[in-house]
């Protein structure tokens, strides 16, 4: 499981561990991984700091997983980042390349490494965390939108390739979910009452356009992810699940 230090990834790691899974989690920094290791239920989990935008980082994480567990039952590709805010004219070639490596190639490389181990599992699953930005892109951060669309397409392609192995591959596409990036925006307001008000204002303003009238929280995705990783989802593959409080209103 990647991107576990904050937000959706952290919530997923905690939820999977609560259900008895042994979690191998990766993120770039060590401080938040250390706090997760103290909070998570159960034992035998491993947490590894690596830069998954680099092939060497992906390989190092996978080797650590194999050394600790000797196999993989479910791969959750969650790591992702906007990296650069801006419209098409404000995003450079370097920004596009960085987004490609973080948001798409990290998943490609981990899938490639994990598939041989997944073939040996009795309940093999790949879950890619994309975004509604893949299907409903806005003007801002086109590089991120495009890479998330690529990740969603990778899901469908891989699902067909791996169907004969019984490996189910699905996508979860969240809408606006409170995460570290939103927290950083609040932190920019300083501490104390002003920061709390900034958080409240952001959540209220964002929630206005959502039929359920609130932003999502990371925990809103955990039930679906657990289901997709379970034996109960054995006839579900190549599917994109939108979790956005009804924001995109897509009937198909």
Residue ranges of predicted features:
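Conserved glycine-rich cofactor-binding loop
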Residues: 3-6
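Conserved glycine-rich Rossmann-like NAD(P)H-binding loop of the short-chain dehydrogenase/reductase
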Residues: 19-35
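Short C-terminal tail/terminal secondary-structure segment
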Residues: 82-85, 136, 226, 237-252
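Substrate-binding pocket helix/loop in short-chain dehydrogenase/reductase
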Residues: 86-88, 92-100, 206
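Active-site helix of classical SDR
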Residues: 111, 147, 155
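Alpha-helical segment proximal to the catalytic Tyr-Lys
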Residues: 116, 160-164, 234
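Residue(s) in the substrate-gating loop at a strand-loop-helix junction
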Residues: 131
